[in-house]
Amino acid sequence: MDKIAIINLKGGVGKSVTACNLAAELAAKSQAVLVVDLDKQGNTSKFFGTLDYDRPSVAEVMLGENTAEEALVCETGTTAVHLLPCDMRMLKANRTILMDNGPRQYYLRDALEVVDDNYNYCLMDCPPDLDMGSINALCAADWVIIPVDCDEWACDGMREILDQIEQVQMYYTPRLKIMGALLTKYRRTKYAAGVTAELLKMPGVPLLQTVIRYTVRVSEAKSAHMPLRVFMPDCSAAADYKALAAEGDSI
């Protein structure tokens, strides 16, 4: 199972939208996909209509109170896409893990071992901060995708992310690689050109060839709880996420 952490310290850059739509596109290529929601806001879980406090979440899985198999949501509305949901219970998990005097970074990696052979891909939707969910995702991952929206503050927090990735590569997970920065909400503006130029100057951060073009259809599809390939398959962003799946599959 190839594990991809989708991370940025900024909110609203398209992490959850990317996780959901990339999962749907990979599934359309006959790949079995596990989506792990690690953000306490639960946007990815809400997208798949699975936010339910009466069932186990990824928080209980990381703490060993339930297995990943017990917490899996298989009825996501998207064939071959399963979900480990997240909600505010992640706050408790973060506090508990922080108080552990032993290795804190492998809770998620170890919890996912039981389902490792069941999927081709695992997409981990990280919160917009470097909490224990994000750290555990990076230490479990093979690859990192960094969504970057095209506004004037787009690269805020990039240095902190890159420093953390470097620490993980050095001490915990040497195989971890940056797949690339993914431009989202892309329009041909001076801000987009400036963001592109700034990213190209950053050492060790490849820029993915695919960009996700801006369209209101993204918000509409999110409100409808449907991936773009189902909601509006002929829109520009649907084509872009299809291209992203092909690009990621080829790396």
Regions found by a protein language model. Name each.
Residues 1-251:
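P-loop NTP-binding core
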